[in-house]
């Protein structure tokens, strides 16, 4: 029952957050906006990036101008999230082991990734029997993803990043 609720909420909230916090430059909602939302709603939040300046555009994933505009928009939400208590980290080696460790610490993980040429985010709920339990707003069922699948997903053209969320009681 728990997972059926998570799936439904995942899709509902994705649409809600996209309406409220949508990017002015890319399709979807910046994770920094979600970090701000969760932080101001009294959840413990960590926003982690592999790159020293949040993202890189060395692969020319976006035009230079679009990258600059998108990065500035992202940074504005980062400031807001940090102001209300989110912990923001840059230059972190985001690995499968780190994800497993954070799941063991009772965090839910919103993991950014890339599917073909599109950036996308999934919710990782747990790690059990050598698989990650993944809620993807594009599907209506819990998916089991291997370490390899998650590792491939999270390596994007602009870096790796994730949002960790849990109740403050931990």
Residue ranges and their predicted role:
Residues 10-11, 88-89, 113, 168-169:
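Flexible propeptides and autoinhibitory/regulatory segments associated with cysteine proteases
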Residues 1-48, 97-101:
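Active-site nucleophile-adjacent alpha helix/oxyanion-hole segment immediately C-terminal to the catalytic cysteine
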Residues 68-111:
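Internal catalytic-core helix/loop-beta-alpha segment
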Residues 41-46, 50-86:
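Low-complexity, serine/threonine/proline-enriched polar segments
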Residues 24-28, 64, 89:
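Short gly/ser-rich anion-binding loops that grip negatively charged ligand groups
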Residues 28, 49, 91-92, 111-114, ...:
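Short His-Asn-centered micro-motif
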Residues 101-108, 112-170:
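Noncatalytic regulatory segments and standalone regulatory/sensor domains
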